[in-house]
Amino acid sequence: MNMEDLVEQIYDKRSKEYFLESYSSYQNSFYRSAIVTLWNLVICDVFFKLEKLHDTYDDSVAGEILDKFIKLMKQNNPTNWELNLLEEISSRIHLIDSIELEKFKHLQKLRHLSAHPIIEKDN
């Protein structure tokens, strides 16, 4: 299956747009940008899925998780809310499994390195 076929399988229009932005960055060799936008896609897509679960299926746990993290975002809480969000959807509603969670943790580390590069004096 080629990439275009895979892109068509992305259900949410907003998520598809985020993915296409990330993929475009990758195709143009803007790798740091691709990583940052891919991380943004992951977090936004989780919110979109939680909204869908809550609004369409009246999933109260999804609603609780949404409310909790929306409040944290509005408070501009410097805690690691993004990773906490992923851990919560993994443990409470099993939207992702433990292997995917570890991959997302790694992606977050890459995102931080891409968005906030470390400059050493000797290099």
Model-identified regions with their sequence ranges:
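A ubiquitous short alpha-helical element
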Residues: 2-8, 69-74, 94-100
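Charge-enriched, short contiguous segments at helix-coil
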Residues: 93-123
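Alpha-helix N-cap/helix-start motif at coil-to-helix transitions, marked by capping-box chemistry
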Residues: 9, 13, 80, 101-108
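Short, charge-rich amphipathic alpha-helical segments embedded
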Residues: 31, 36, 41-61
